[in-house]
Amino acid sequence: MKILLIGMGGTIASVKGENGYEASLSVKEVLDIAGIKDCEDCDFLDLKNVDSTLIQPEDWVDLAETLYKNVKKYDGIIVTHGTDTLAYTSSMISFMLRNPPIPIVFTGSMIPATEENSDAPLNLQTAIKFATSGIRGVYVAFNGKVMLGVRTSKVRTMSRDAFESINYPIIAELRGEDLVVNFIPKFNNGEVTLDLRHDPKVLVIKLIPGLSGDIFRAAVELGYRGIVIEGYGAGGIPYRGSDLLQTIEELSKEIPIVMTTQAMYDGVDLTRYKVGRLALRAGVIPAGDMTKEATVTKLMWILGHTNNVEEIKVLMRKNLVGELRD
């Protein structure tokens, strides 16, 4: 089967220099150094070579366009990418590139491929096995697991087991030499489409005790077109000793204000507590069980299509690519 590997940089492609590790290896060099032998019918393309902290929305556009041009030429595509923003990229690609007819698999490593104890060989082998599975969609392969790209979050900063599938089944797992498929997502059978429209003017604000409405007003004045609040637990807005709820009620008529949770699992339910119900009445849009990465990139993508707050509310609460429980 014919596979394309696209290099974006990251730890997997990094070499240690005077200023620490820096992405510099080509994706072909990464494969060779990792000792991957089962990729004889592979092509290689170096699109970027950067630390993923440097990834910007324009890089998503470049990658989505490149993927779109190649999805009908290959049986699978692997994207090597830095881990810090990998889940943002896999989520945005899921929204920009609909109904890919092949597996598109993101992977990387926590330890550079040049190091003896690198996890690059395991992750690349897992990605190659899944890229030849014929299971279409956008995925992340890491530490012997395959996860849906729009349901993946980085949860550890040092461990090889850096990513988890959030509120969604693990798609496949490596057991010995075999990749065992546990779950196949259901997607529409439509033709692959590319829709790059998005607006990156989204601000994420973490709710903490004492937070006031000033920062929300400032965000609107600075031209931000959407706000995501990382709230507590199941979600809610404080109404005691703060102008926050009143401010949000005023601003939610102008821009979408979405609430996700600081907790990793289970998502938000704004109907559960009074603080949540008051937030709903104030116009806050619940993110449901979406990851923070999916919430942010979905809002960016929707803002590229409409400014109408009511339309945005409907789309944010609609499952588009598997990011949200129906």
From Swiss-Prot:
UniProt: L-aspartate binding residues: 11, 51-52, 83-84
Cross-referenced CDD domains: L-asparaginase_I
SMART domains recorded: Asparaginase
Effect of residue 274 to E: Shows improved enzymatic properties at physiological conditions (pH 7.4 and 37 degrees Celsius) as compared to the wild type with a 2.6-fold increase in catalytic efficiency
Active site residues according to the UniProt entry: 11 (nucleophile), 83 (charge relay system), 84 (charge relay system), 154 (charge relay system), 273 (charge relay system)
Biotechnological relevance of this protein: Absence of glutaminase activity, higher stability, and mesoactivity makes P.furiosus L-asparaginase and its mutants promising candidates for clinical as well as industrial usage.
Record's keyword terms, sorted: Hydrolase
Domain Asparaginase/glutaminase: 1-319
Gene3D superfamilies: 3.40.50.40, L-asparaginase, N-terminal domain
Catalytic activity entry: L-asparagine + H2O = L-aspartate + NH4(+)
pH dependence text: Optimum pH is 9.0.
Function: Catalyzes the hydrolysis of L-asparagine into L-aspartate and ammonia. Displays no glutaminase activity, a highly desirable therapeutic property.
Additional note from the record: Microbial L-asparaginase is considered as an important biopharmaceutical drug enzyme in the treatment of childhood acute lymphoblastic leukemia (ALL). It functions by reducing the availability of circulatory L-asparagine to tumor cells. The principle behind the cytotoxic effect of L-asparaginase stems from the fact that the leukemic lymphoblastic tumor cells and other blood tumor cells are auxotrophs towards the L-asparagine and exhibit low L-asparagine synthetase (ASNS) activity for de novo synthesis of L-asparagine.
Self-association and partners: Homodimer. Heating induces higher order association. Forms homotetramers at 80 degrees Celsius.
Protein name: L-asparaginase
UniProt source species: Pyrococcus furiosus (strain ATCC 43587 / DSM 3638 / JCM 8422 / Vc1)
